[in-house]
């Protein structure tokens, strides 16, 4: 029995649960940049098939932005989370605590670089090296929360997923052994 069959409806509901959780947690009051979307994009890339991997974080962002309101830099934010899905896909062959932590850190850095470079293109900062530097310096206080949330939510999401997978593997082994005894 395959893992997805053993997980049954739980695995099928995973994308929808992630979308709902991501949107709700992003809308709920929280400190700036302390949201689960980066970790959700990582997990989606690591465990969901093809289009679902990208659809989950984009749908969570779109749902929450429909409530919160879209903003000038949204294309940069969406692009950064789609890129984080690609980082998550590098975890597919082997997910370890160290690899998940490294992917979470890389995701935080990528989000910081992409979104702040995009912010620099806007009207707030002069389009000079001094303006670029001012933009990145102003963003440093927010980077801490991005890093903390990506690490904490990644450990939580991957831990929950791996625990559920372990339970499903045991269930599949029991069902397989029971089917084998009856034949």
Question: Where is each model-derived feature located?
Answer:
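Hydrophobic transmembrane alpha-helices
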Residues: 1-46, 52-55
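Membrane-interface helix-boundary motifs at transmembrane edges
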Residues: 4-5, 90-100
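Structural signal for the C-terminal ends of transmembrane alpha-helices
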Residues: 24-25, 44-51, 87-95, 160-168
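Central hydrophobic cores of alpha-helical transmembrane segments
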Residues: 53-64, 100-108
């Amino acid at each position: 029995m395959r893992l997805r069959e053993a997980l049954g409806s739980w695995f099928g509901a995973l994308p929808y649960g992630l979308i709902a959780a991501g949107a709700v947690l992003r809308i709920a009051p929280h400190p700036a940049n302390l949201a689960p979307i980066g970790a959700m994009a990582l997990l989606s890339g690591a465990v969901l098939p093809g289009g679902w991997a990208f659809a989950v974080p984009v749908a969570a962002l779109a749902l929450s932005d429909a409530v919160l309101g879209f903003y000038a830099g949204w294309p940069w934010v969406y692009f950064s989370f789609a890129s984080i899905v690609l980082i998550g896909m590098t975890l597919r062959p082997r997910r370890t605590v160290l690899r998940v932590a490294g992917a979470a850190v890389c995701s935080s850095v990528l989000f910081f670089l992409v979104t702040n470079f995009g912010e620099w293109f806007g009207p707030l900062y002069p389009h000079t090296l001094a303006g670029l530097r001012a933009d990145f310096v102003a963003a440093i206080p927010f980077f801490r929360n991005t890093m903390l949330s990506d690490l904490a939510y990644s450990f939580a999401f991957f831990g929950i997923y791996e625990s559920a997978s372990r339970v499903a593997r045991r269930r599949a082994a029991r069902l397989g052994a029971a089917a084998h005894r009856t034949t």
